Amino acid sequence: MNIHNLFPTPIGFFDRAITDEEKLFILNLEQRPNLGNTTSTNNKILNGMTALRSFIEESVNLYFQSTVRPKHDVSLRITQSWANFSSPGQHHHKHAHPNSYISGVYYIQTNPNDRIYFYRDEWKQIKFPSENYNEYNSESWWFEAFEGRLILFPSSLTHMVPTVEGDTTRISLSFNTFPVGVVGEEVELTGLRLEV
């Protein structure tokens, strides 16, 4: 038997140590309530963190070029960036990111067992319990979330981070992107030029 992976979902991983200055910048951000945790009131925090922004932009570009391989001159721009704060007993609710193409999360501070869960919303009508879960039969899949880890994913992919079970507040930086440049194809009547 041969099995082919048709339309796989790319999840990108990049690592970079957070600097003391960057961490202090994040810790001093004003916060507001969110569903299950708190988030920064500033939703463009990467504007104040040039080196980290450059790392994230380079990672997003590599991910985009490697997975989409666009024919025309198009790139992704970061539209919003904010910090999430989950104290012990708090969580980050299940959600996706509308009005964005690729989203990402960079972990600033974590506990040993922190994870991010991704979900697929197909097969809700019929469920088959499995003896061994894998990429084909799972409704969700998780990856470790640790300090300095950047995870990129399609913005439409539902995800969440469970309740903090350790003693440390989990802090992450999230962001959205949107294409700038030529999208679609003029001769196919799908062409669109998006400019800032």
Please identify what each model-predicted range represents.
Residues 83-152, 162, 169, 179-192:
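Catalytic core of non-heme Fe(II) oxygenases with the double-stranded beta-helix
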